[in-house]
């Protein structure tokens, strides 16, 4: 009987460990650190409610499945084979984890020389890129994301995806490694900007963490 109880207790601990596979990383700044572009209330709700829910619901969706032993990238790469719950929550968790890192209270960060060169060669100028990226977000009907990604040939491209899809998924038309993602779900901006998504997209550039985007660009190129 005692052995059975110990075994049962071990199973409980194992289940708890499995359900904690994917966790939010701590927010790298205070909720009010981006005021002027992203208000504190929006950031708190976005991170502590929406972001937390995607991680928790992803763990529930993969419980008892082979995806428990996979990395998030592996899960995203075979989205076409997975349930809507896994697709939506894996995408939501990945997208938000990226989103928190590409924002910063640090002022006037700039792309690295290598990334700036690639942006100029691809889009003509940094301002032209920002305009194209903002348009991708503004034109996304309903909820979704705008992306700057690196394709299989190491080239930059801008795209947008619906809901919580992203360019890592095998179901999207334009595939690549995201290095910058802008959330255009209403929960990302509605408390401050209401229906003025374009104003939100304009303001987000003021708190963009180009150091992080540049780092992700280098990492994406190193895997090509």
Q: How should each PLM-predicted stretch be described?
A:
Residues 1-21:
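Bacterial Sec-dependent N-terminal signal peptides
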């Amino acid at each position: 009987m005692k052995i059975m109880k110990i075994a049962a207790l071990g199973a409980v601990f194992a289940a708890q460990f499995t359900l904690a596979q994917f966790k939010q990383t701590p927010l790298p700044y205070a909720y009010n650190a981006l005021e002027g572009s992203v208000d504190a209330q929006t950031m708190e709700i976005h991170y502590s409610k929406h972001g937390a829910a995607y991680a928790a619901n992803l763990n529930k969706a993969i419980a008892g499945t082979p995806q428990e032993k996979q990395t998030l990238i592996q899960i995203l790469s075979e989205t076409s084979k997975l349930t809507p719950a896994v697709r939506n929550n894996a995408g939501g968790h990945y997208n938000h984890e990226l989103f928190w890192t590409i924002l910063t209270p640090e002022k006037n960060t700039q792309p690295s020389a290598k990334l700036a060169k690639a942006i100029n060669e691809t889009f003509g100028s940094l301002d032209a890129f920002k305009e194209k990226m903002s348009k991708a977000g503004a034109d996304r009907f309903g909820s979704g994301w705008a992306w700057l990604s690196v394709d299989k040939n190491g080239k930059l491209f801008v795209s947008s995806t619906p809901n919580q899809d992203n360019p890592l998924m095998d179901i999207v038309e334009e595939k690549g490694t995201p290095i910058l993602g802008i959330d255009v779900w209403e929960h990302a901006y509605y408390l401050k900007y209401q229906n003025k998504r374009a104003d939100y997209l304009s303001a987000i550039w003021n708190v963009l963490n180009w150091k992080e985007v540049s780092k992700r660009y280098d990492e994406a190129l190193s895997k090509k």
